[in-house]
Amino acid sequence: VLFRSAMSPVIREQHDEYPMITDPKGRMIVGQFGSYVPEMLKMKNFDLEPGDVILQSDPFMCGGAISHINDWIILVPVFFQGGLVGFTSMFGHMMDVGGPVPGSMPTAATSIFGEGLRIPPIKLYEGGVLNQAALDLIMTNTRTPEMNYSDLMAILAGCRAGEKRIIELCERFGADTYADACDALLERTERAMRSLIV
């Protein structure tokens, strides 16, 4: 979904993005960049409801899952029959997020404050309603608003595709079976890693 929808070459051609699916505790079930969800939710206590979408780009508020503010993370809580069954998430590298130089990666920066716009975890959508003021503020602070907007919506579409598949699994097998399968997958992965290390 993301590669077919993204506009910038950073995502479309370089594939500088990573997806993730977690259980309700934020433990990564599928993914590549490590789960930042427990760390972020601990720092930012959101009341999550269906239709919410969280956006952030702050490396200090995601347990180091991203390394710089060009990486925008979308987090979508997945609900089934009123209960939280997990999260889908994806980050993608944005072409420009403001700051003193195009591309927002200044070699002379001595702190994160010299890089550009840092986004703390915010609700981009709340109950399915877009936070237009937040989106306007973010897009006003980039040199590439059209690309950033397109890529952001493509990332969200990718998360929504994951959300849809999780709900389909819960409808087919039940939420309890889905949760048990997630636990079994985590336990199997732990056993495999222990056997490699020991």
Regions found by a protein language model. Give the residues of each.
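N-terminal leader/propeptide and maturation segments of large enzyme subunits in energy/redox metabolism
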Residues: 1, 115-194
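Terminal presequence/propeptide segments associated with secretion/organelle targeting
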Residues: 1-15, 29, 33, 37-47, ...
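Gly/Pro-rich turn-and-neighbor structural signature
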Residues: 6-62, 170-198
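Acidic side chains
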Residues: 16, 23, 52, 71, ...
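Short, solvent-exposed loop/edge-beta patches enriched in aromatic
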Residues: 24, 80-83
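A short, hydrophobic, proline-anchored segment that marks a local hinge/packing element in signaling
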Residues: 71-81, 89
